[in-house]
C-alpha cells in the first residue's frame, strides 16, 4: 500500500458516511410522506363517518404514546436530520389527534342540538305552561315535523301563490258582549303569522298546497311547450322564406341562431318575454314587408353564409 492510498482512506470513509446519511434522510422523508398520506385518508374517512372517531382516537393515542417512548429512548443517540424528523413526527401525530377529537366533538354536538333547541324555541315563542308536543314511538321529538310544516308555509308565502285556505283569516272565539264593534280585517302578514301559530297536522291544507304547486308547475310546462312550438314554427317559416328568395343554408342551426339574434334580446329572459317576441316575429314574417327581415339577413351574413347578399334585403 502506497502512502497516497493510505492517506485517501479517511476521505473515502467520510464520503461513505455522507452517502449513508443522505440515503437515511431520503428514506426517512419517504416514510414521512407515506405516513402522512395514510393519516390524510384516515381523517377524510372519519370526516365522512364521525362514528368511527372514537376508535380512531384510541389508535392514534396509542401510536402517539409509542412515538413519544421511541423519542425518549433514542433522542440522546440521534443527531442531525433524524432527530428533526422525529420532532416532526410528534408534531404531526399531535395535530392528527386534535383533528380527530374536534371531529368527534362536532359530531356529538350535532346529535345533541336537535334535542336541546326545540324546548328552548318553544319557551321563547311563549309556550309557557302549555304541554310540549308528544314524542313518537322511536323517542324522537315531533318538533322536526312542526318546523318542516312552518317552513313549508313560509315557502308558500314567499312564492306569492299560496292557496286560498292559507290566506283566509283564522276564526277565533271573540270575547266580550255580542254588540261589540267588529275588529278590522287583519293584514296578510298578520294572517300568515296567525296561521304559523297554529299547531301542525291538518292534512287538508297540505293537500291544497300540493295541488296549488302542481297547478303552477303545469302552467309553467304549458308556457315552455308553447315557446318550443313557436320556435320550431319560426325555424320552418325562415326556411320557407329563404328558399323563396333563393337562399340555401347547409346547417339548419344557422337559421335558428339567426332567429334568436334577430330578436335583439337575450335568450335567457323570462318565458313570457320569449313567447311575446316569438309571436311578434311570427306575425312579421307573415306580412309582405317584414320589418325584422333585414336584421335577420344581417345575422345570416354574419354567420358566414356567402349566398346571402344585398339583393335579399327588403326595401
Swiss-Prot record:
It comes from the Eukaryota. One of its GO terms (molecular function) is proton transmembrane transporter activity. One of its GO terms (cellular component) is mitochondrial membrane. Residues 154-214 are annotated as: Disordered. It is found in: Mitochondrion membrane. Residues 203-214 have a biased composition (Basic and acidic residues). InterPro entries: ATP_synth_F0_csu, ATP_synth_F0_csu_sf, ATPase_proteolipid_c-like_dom, F/V-ATP_Csub_sf. Pfam families: ATP-synt_C. It is a multi-pass membrane protein. Residues 154-171 have a biased composition (Polar residues). The chain crosses the membrane at residues 19-39, 56-76, 81-101. Gene3D superfamilies: F1F0 ATP synthase subunit C (1.20.20.10). One of its GO terms (biological process) is proton motive force-driven ATP synthesis. Keywords: Membrane, Mitochondrion, Transmembrane, Transmembrane helix. Belongs to the ATPase C chain family. This is Uncharacterized ATP synthase C chain-like protein. It comes from Arabidopsis thaliana.
